[in-house]
């Protein structure tokens, strides 16, 4: 039987983040007892999402101690994705995590941030159809969720539930992912 200790994840939010993706990730990870920090990459804890939903982050990205964090996650959205890419703490943390074997995940347009950092070179990945051409160096797959080593990508809001369940599986185990899937009545 798999044994999982309390995992920690940071989900980066920025001005213009796709709120459905971002909040779904936070909600399902927290249901799985993953300790999630919502970290603002916009210099303020108060964020306005891509569809004008007001969100309060737990901390600024620059204030988070990443030393015991197991995974960082980048939701998509425009202009959220370029705003994440413009934040040095976000990009430096993604590079550090990817190179040290820690988990990095991105959905929708956000895998383009990982590609711009060279983190998808020689890896399988996916992104929103409008951003697949930005995945330089990657073998692009047009599927909901792609896991290649320590990097997980998804193609967008339509794949957000399977993406979130995959992150739950990675951080809390298959049994917990199955429990969450049943609890939310996701039958796909």
Q: Where are these predicted regions, by residue range?
A:
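Short N-terminal binding/cap micro-motifs at the start of the first secondary-structure element
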Residues: 17-22, 46
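Active-site-adjacent pocket-lining segments in enzyme domains
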Residues: 8-11, 16-17, 31-40, 58-188
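Short glycine/proline-centered loop/turn elements that form peptide/ligand docking sites
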Residues: 23, 40-43
């Amino acid at each position: 039987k798999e044994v999982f200790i309390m995992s920690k994840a940071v989900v980066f939010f920025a001005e213009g983040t796709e709120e459905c993706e971002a909040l779904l990730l936070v909600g399902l990870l927290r249901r799985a007892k993953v300790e999630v920090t919502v970290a603002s990459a916009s210099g303020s804890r108060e964020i306005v999402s891509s569809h004008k939903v007001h969100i309060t982050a737990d901390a600024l990205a620059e204030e988070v101690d990443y030393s015991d964090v197991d995974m960082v996650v980048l939701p998509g959205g425009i202009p959220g994705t370029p705003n994440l890419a413009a934040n040095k703490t976000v990009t430096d943390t993604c590079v550090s995590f990817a190179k040290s074997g820690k988990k990095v995940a991105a959905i929708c347009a956000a895998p383009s941030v990982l590609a711009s950092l060279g983190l998808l070179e020689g890896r399988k990945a996916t992104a929103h159809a409008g951003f697949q051409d930005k995945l330089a160096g990657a073998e692009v797959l047009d599927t909901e969720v792609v896991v290649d080593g320590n990097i997980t990508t998804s193609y967008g809001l339509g794949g957000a539930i399977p993406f979130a369940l995959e992150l739950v599986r990675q951080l809390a185990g298959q049994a917990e992912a199955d429990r969450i899937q049943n609890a939310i009545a996701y039958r796909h």
